[in-house]
Amino acid sequence: MVPPLSRRDALKALGIAGAAALQPPGPVDTGARAAAPILPLTSTSDVHVPPRGRSFLKFSFDHPEPSVPFEGFSFGLMVFTRENAYGLDQARMSVHETDGGLEVRATGLVWAGGQQRADGEVRLALRRIPDGVEWDATVAMDRPIKAVTTVLRGVPRGRVAAGGGAFTDPGDDELLFGYPFGGGDLFVAGGMNTPLLQVEEAGGGCCYVASRDTAVRTKRFYLQPGGQGYRIEAVHEVEGWKDEHRVTLPPWRVGRAASLEAATAAHYAHLAQAYRLPDWDTRPDVPDWLRRTALVTTLHGMHYTGYIFNDYPKMLATLRWMAARMPGERILAFLAAWDGRYYWNYPAYELDPRMGGERAFRRLIDEGHDLGVRFMPMFGANAANRHQPSFPALAEAATAKVDGDTMDLNWVDWDNDRHMEGWLAYMNLGVAAWREWLGGRISAMIERFGVDAYFLDIAGGWVNNPRADMHAGIRQLVQDLRARHPGVVAVGEMHYDALLEVLPLFHAGGGGPAGPHVQRHARFFQHLSHPAPGRGSTGVHEEGFSRFDPDTLSLAPHAIPTLNVVDDTLARHQDLMDAVIRRARERAGI
C-alpha cells in the first residue's frame, strides 16, 4: 500500500515547499493547485529489501519513481531506450484534473539514479472505469524508445494467476511473467498466452492488471512483494523493427472483479473483438471432417539420432488396426518426424529412404485415405539447421532479440551429451525468404500427396526482434497456403491470444480457468510429448519418458483424445490402445 506522506513530503509534492529546488530553469506554471500529490517514491519503496524469497535482478540503489495516487493505486513510469533506463523528473512533473481522471505531465527525465537529467516529454492519462482505472501514456525522446514500464502500487498480496491460469501461492517470491513466449526470455519469465494478471483478494474476488492492446507486442509483469502489497511493473515493449522516438502506450487497466472467472471473461471479450476471433462453430477454416474428428494419433517417425520408431509401412499397419476398431474418418494421423532425423533435417522436408521412401509414403497416404483417415505432417515454423545446404539462402531470416542478441533454438540436448545444442537458428516468418521457403515445402507435400492438414511446430513462439513481425508472418503464410489449397487445415503447437484468429487447432493448452473462453474459438489435442501407452515414451520428443496412467489413460478432459504411438505400442500395448479408442468413441458418441 502507499505509505502516508509526511507534511514536508506532501508540501514538496504539491509544489508549495522547496519550490526553487523542484522547479526546472525557465518559466513555471504557477496556476491552479495540483490535482493530486506527487509521491516521492523510489524503486525500494514498499518492498522487502533485501528480498525474502526467490528474486530477480534489480537496481542496487534507490531509483526515482515519483508516482501519483489515484483511486486507491499509485502510478509511475520508467522509460527504456536501447542504451539506458530513465525515470520521471519529479521537479518537472505536474498533475491536472481531466474529465473523469487525471493527467500527469513530465517535461524531463532523469537517469543515473536521479543524478543526471535528460530531455524528454511524458503524458500519463488516468481514467476512472466502473471497476478501477484505465491508463495510457505518450513518451517522446530524442532517441529510439525500447520499452515503457508503468510502476503500479496498491495491489494487495495474495495468490497470483497469470494469463487466465489458476491461482498459486508465491509466498515471498518475486514473480515475472512474459507475453507471449515468455516475453522474449523463455526460461526466465513464466509464460502467459494473454497479458492478464490476477491477484486473489479476501472474499473470493480478485484484483486484475491487463493490457488492452490490439496488436501482438511484448508485455511483462514483474511482482515485488512488500509488507502489505505488491509493487508491479507492467512493461510494454515497442516493436523491435521500428525506431520510435515517440511512443503511445496501448491502454492498460487495473481493477477489481467479483471472481477470477469474471475478470477472465471480461478480458476474453476484449480479445474476441480486438483480434476478430471467430467462433469455432462457424469459423470457415474448419472443414466438416475436423469437426467430426474423435481421435488424434501421433505416429512418431525418426528420432534426432536416427532411431526409427515407426517407418511408413508400420504407420500404415497401425492405422489399419485402429480403423478396424473405430471409423477411420474420425481419425486424424499426426505424422511427427516423417522427414527423417527430427529437427536435424529441418528445413529440407523430404521423404526419408530409411523410413520407406516415396513409394511407401504414398501408399501410407493413399491407403490411409481409403480407410477414411486424415493426415497431418509436421513442419517447424521457426527452426532451420545451419548445417543444411539450404540455410545460406535463408540466413537473413534468423532471429535476434530486441536488443540484437542472436536467438537460437538452443534449449534442447538432442544427443544427450548433457549440453544444449546450438546449431538450430530460430527463424522469423515475418521475413519473406523464410516464409516463402517454408510455404513452398508445405505446398509441395499437399500437391504431391494430398495431405489434409499441416502442423506448425512452435507456432506460438512470437519473439520481438529487429527485422519483422512474426505474427504478421504466420498470418501471411496461412493466408497464402489457404488461397493455394482451400480446405487444407493449418494447425499449431501452442497459441497466444491473437493466434486464435489464424489457427483453429492446437496441441498444447486449452485447459485451466480460461479454457472455456479459449475453446470458444479453437480446439486442442494432446502434445507430441504425451506419453505413449506402456513405459510412457515420448517418441521423437526430447523429454524421453513420462508416466502413462492406465486408469485415466492420460487423457485430458479438455482435449480431443490422443494416442501416441512409438516403437512398441502396437506390438505390446494393444489393450491400452483399445481402451483409448473406446474412450474416444464414448466421448464422440460413436
Could you say what each language-model-derived stretch is?
Residues 334-337, 438-466:
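Active-site groove signature of glycoside hydrolases
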Residues 302-395:
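Aromatic- and glycine-enriched glycan-recognition loops and surfaces
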Residues 2-17:
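N-terminal secretory signal peptides and thylakoid transit peptides that target proteins
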Residues 298-313, 345-358, 420-436, 459-469:
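The substrate-binding groove and active-site-proximal loops of carbohydrate-active enzymes
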Residues 4-5, 24-38:
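C-terminal segment of N-terminal export signals and the immediately downstream linker at the start
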Residues 244-245, 250, 439, 468-590:
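Active-site-proximal substrate-binding groove within the catalytic cores of carbohydrate-active enzymes
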Residues 39-332, 367, 374:
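Carbohydrate-recognition beta-sandwich/jelly-roll modules
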Residues 377, 381-444, 522:
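Active-site-adjacent "subsite" loops/lids of carbohydrate-active enzymes
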